[in-house]
């Protein structure tokens, strides 16, 4: 992508980051999060909701834009265009991560998309528009959408639409799918991997495989938090993808950290490590997470209510009197993240720069990820967060 981003796009990315951390905090506040790992793709959800905003009118459009952090919907579309065309462009042919992203609009054959919506969806969101028969072939369309997602995510996401989720009352399905596979710049030696104790939130421990390294690492340490940056191999463009491990010092500090990030999105930028440091000990657990959610309740908790009810105004999507009766019944989202010695495989479907005054880390420290932590995958040049989640038990995969 371009070496510089316009100020308005950077501001939109800051809003997107805030949306990401608000969602992460909402997911972590779920009682099930105390015993289950979680992962989701904020950029996937953000793009999907931005596309819905393009087809919304009146108060519904305003509420969508406000939830996504934008006062003007044009900012959402400009950001989506940058994200889809540049941030999420594949870099495997130039030595970088394998990235695949696709948007889809599946509309019932009885309806016609409004030309203005279709043009925006195709030109800015690079969406593929397909006419389908929900009214008599709902099961076949379900299989078609699931097959599309499975193909984009190279088989990692299956059955995004549960059986029965589409029926003869469905008129429109908007979706996207994201796949990411990156290799670490400095890979771990699998021969050094060995099991050790990981402490759960209840104070008990389990034996789980840890990756070890004696190399210097990008680490910051302050405010009761240690942050590890693991860069992925960079391609021949300006993008730089990295995974971040956010480890609170306190065993039970995961939830307060999630709340802190939600309240102060700039907190992450202030703690991103800028230099490598020598380590006395370093160990990071391998983990794999697969999570499927129906996201409408989460979004309602963030104040997004109108698109899901009788007052929804999605009249800018289709050319039909029926447009006044359209509303969103559900938003399905699935994510998969795997971290091992060679790198990360991940998939999902559905700013003024801070001046840092970061204290230099100690010359030698430990980074031992032996209790619950947050993680995220970010494109550092733009600041776009692709995936975010938490691990409370590395042995749980779903």
From Swiss-Prot:
The reactive center loop (RCL) extends out from the body of the protein and directs binding to the target protease. The protease cleaves the serpin at the reactive site within the RCL, establishing a covalent linkage between the carboxyl group of the serpin reactive site and the serine hydroxyl of the protease. The resulting inactive serpin-protease complex is highly stable. PANTHER family: SERINE PROTEASE INHIBITOR, SERPIN (PTHR11461), SERPIN-Z1C (PTHR11461:SF317). The record marks 357-358 as: Reactive bond. Keywords: Protease inhibitor, Serine protease inhibitor. The keyword Cytoplasm does not apply. GO terms for molecular function: serine-type endopeptidase inhibitor activity. It comes from Triticum aestivum. This is Serpin-Z2B. GO terms for cellular component: extracellular space. Gene3D superfamilies: Alpha-1-antitrypsin, domain 1 (2.30.39.10), Antithrombin, subunit I, domain 2 (3.30.497.10). Pfam families: Serpin. Residues 343-367 are annotated as: RCL. Belongs to the serpin family. Inhibits chymotrypsin, cathepsin G and trypsin in vitro.
């Amino acid at each position: 992508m371009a070496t510089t981003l316009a100020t308005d796009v950077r501001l939109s990315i800051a809003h997107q980051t805030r949306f990401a951390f608000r969602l992460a905090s909402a997911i972590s506040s779920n009682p099930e999060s105390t015993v289950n790992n979680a992962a989701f793709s904020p950029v996937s959800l953000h793009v999907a909701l931005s596309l819905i905003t393009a087809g919304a009118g009146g108060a519904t459009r305003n509420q969508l834009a406000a939830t996504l952090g934008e006062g003007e919907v044009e900012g959402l579309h400009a950001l989506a265009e940058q994200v889809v065309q540049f941030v999420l462009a594949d870099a495997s042919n130039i030595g970088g991560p394998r990235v695949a992203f696709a948007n889809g609009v599946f509309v019932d054959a009885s309806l016609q998309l409004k030309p203005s919506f279709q043009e925006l969806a195709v030109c800015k969101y690079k969406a593929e528009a397909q006419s389908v028969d929900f009214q008599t072939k709902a099961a076949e369309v379900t299989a078609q959408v699931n097959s599309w997602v499975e193909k984009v995510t190279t088989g990692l996401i299956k059955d995004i639409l549960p059986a029965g989720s589409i029926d003869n009352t469905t008129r429109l399905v908007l979706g996207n799918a994201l796949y990411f596979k990156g290799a670490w710049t400095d890979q771990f030696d699998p021969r050094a991997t060995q099991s050790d104790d990981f402490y759960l939130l209840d104070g008990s421990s389990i034996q789980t495989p840890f990756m070890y390294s004696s190399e210097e690492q990008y680490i910051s340490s302050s405010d009761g938090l240690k942050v590890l940056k693991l860069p992925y191999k960079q391609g021949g463009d300006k993008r730089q993808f990295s995974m971040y491990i956010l480890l609170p010092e306190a065993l039970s500090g995961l939830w307060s950290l999630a709340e802190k990030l939600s309240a102060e999105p700039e907190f992450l930028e202030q703690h991103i490590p800028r230099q490598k440091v020598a380590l006395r000990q370093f160990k990071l657990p391998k983990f794999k997470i697969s999570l499927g959610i129906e996201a409408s309740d989460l979004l309602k908790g963030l104040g997004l209510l109108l698109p899901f009810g009788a007052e929804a105004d999605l009249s800018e999507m289709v050319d039909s009197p029926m447009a006044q009766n359209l509303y969103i019944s559900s938003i399905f989202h699935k994510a998969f993240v795997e971290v091992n010695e060679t790198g990360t495989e991940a998939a999902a479907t559905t700013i003024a720069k801070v001046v840092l005054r970061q204290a230099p880390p100690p010359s030698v420290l430990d980074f031992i990820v032996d209790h619950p932590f947050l993680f995220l995958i970010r494109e550092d040049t733009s600041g776009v967060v692709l995936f975010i989640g938490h691990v409370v038990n590395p042995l749980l995969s779903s």
